[in-house]
């Protein structure tokens, strides 16, 4: 039998955060993670419901960089339900959070939309920072 991995990029929207402002974490969560629609939620909770009903486990690639803006509690709110339901969490990284982070940017003056916008040493530093945030949020 062929092994199949169901993977889901799981992230707060940096664009929505820029439009609504950094104080709108709850709304960004509802729209980006829960994916609330008039017909109900279609985000991570719904995706896990469907997978659980079919005996399938998913791999959720979680972007922890919003911790620069909201702290690791915002990431734990994403990671904990995934792990509690027996699914896997792995690292996903959007460097555009560096711009939103302002003074909390660990690479002062450096911003970019993609990892290739950074030097190799900066990429390594970003991955290390993101890994630490993800682990602080409860990922193994």
Segments the model singles out, each with a brief description of its role:
Residues 1-140:
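Catalytic alpha-helical scaffold of carbohydrate-active enzymes acting on polysaccharides/glycoconjugates
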């Amino acid at each position: 039998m062929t092994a199949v991995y169901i993977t889901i990029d799981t992230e707060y929207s940096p664009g929505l955060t820029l439009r609504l402002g950094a104080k709108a974490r709850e709304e960004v969560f509802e729209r980006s993670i829960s994916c609330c629609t008039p017909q109900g939620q279609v985000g991570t909770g719904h995706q896990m419901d469907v997978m659980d009903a079919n005996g399938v486990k998913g791999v959720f690639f979680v972007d922890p960089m919003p911790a620069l803006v909201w702290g690791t509690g915002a990431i734990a709110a994403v990671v904990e339900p995934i792990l509690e339901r027996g699914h896997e969490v792995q690292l996903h990284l959007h460097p555009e959070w560096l711009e939103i982070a302002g003074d909390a940017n660990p690479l002062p003056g450096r911003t970019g939309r993609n990892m290739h916008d950074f030097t190799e040493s900066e990429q390594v530093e970003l991955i290390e920072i993101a890994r630490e945030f993800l682990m602080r949020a409860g990922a193994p």
